[in-house]
Amino acid sequence: MKQLCCVSLLLFCGASIVFAQSSASTDPLAPTRDSKSAAEIDREWRQSVAKYDGERNRLVAEAEKQANDGPYRPDWGSLMKYQQPQWYKDAKFGIFIHWGVYSVPAAENEWYPRNMYRPDEGAYKNFHEHFAKGDESKGYKDLIPLFRAEHFDAATWAKVFKESGAQYVVPVAEHHDGFSMYDSGLSDWTVVKMGPRRDTLGELAKAVRAEGLHFGLSSHRAEHNFFYDGGRAIRSDVNDPKYASLYGPAHQWFEAGGDDHSLINDWTWVSDAWTRDWLARDTELVEKYKPEIVYFDWWIGQPNFRGAVAEFASFYYNYAAAHGYTGVINFKDYSLNWKAAVRDFERGQQDRIIADHWQTDT
């Protein structure tokens, strides 16, 4: 049994600080954790993204159709017959890239967006000292104009990755922060419409493939459901429905206990609308960029995602087969059936010898 290793990079960027003044005439910053129900919060989020309902519905319909048209079906009995591609079994080293708006502060890590709304965290202190400077209306949205990527050169990155000996490259398409690092037709908050105003993911995909490397991507959209929940407990812009399309529902996270993230005990509110949106966004990524690897974080194992995950896996495997390649899905912990995809250990490794290939990233 071979172990695959994926090295993770977290990139920071510096920027000057410029903010626009809020013109809100009411108090949209007031805490909402105790004053709004989960259903009301979810309704506000749905309304904020309603203009994309047509494209979302199209993508979901496409996923459902392709999921039932090919060698796989959207059920675990079928998906457990999955076979990894030989190139992936033979690969020893890959590059995983964390890079996004959260790089602007050049502090903490990619969980900065969550922790900047939690008063006990260093990111909260950093943001208020260096960016907000006493203005409660400032939030993560105000870091986006500072993320310009003016020195980003995909060809140079790809050349360095090639010289490092990596066989595959997996940049984050969207992290928990909800900002799409790709050209999404389902959001206003994208790297094409704001900040750099260019499709950095698309540029990197082209450059990586030009170097003869395999291209994948990661999606952390599932976790966005709760990521900004700290902002609902304090005065912050997370409470303003005007920004619900960026901050998402920000439902209170009832985290499962235990080091293994036993998600069967996770009681966080997840609506059908959210899992449908998740399916649409990941379908969009596959159709636009044709990744050979799709990496998911642990929260796709939350019980409410089971049906959507099976639908996506069958869609992706069938789509890849129809386009001449074999797709790989990475998952963490116990969030997916071991036989249906490739298990990834973040900052860890398999504790015993098993027949299946697995991956570690650090």
Where are the predicted features?
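Positively charged n-region of N-terminal signal peptides that target proteins for export
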Residues: M1-L4
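Bacterial N-terminal signal peptides
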Residues: C6-S16
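Mature catalytic domains of secreted/periplasmic carbohydrate-active enzymes
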Residues: Q21-T362
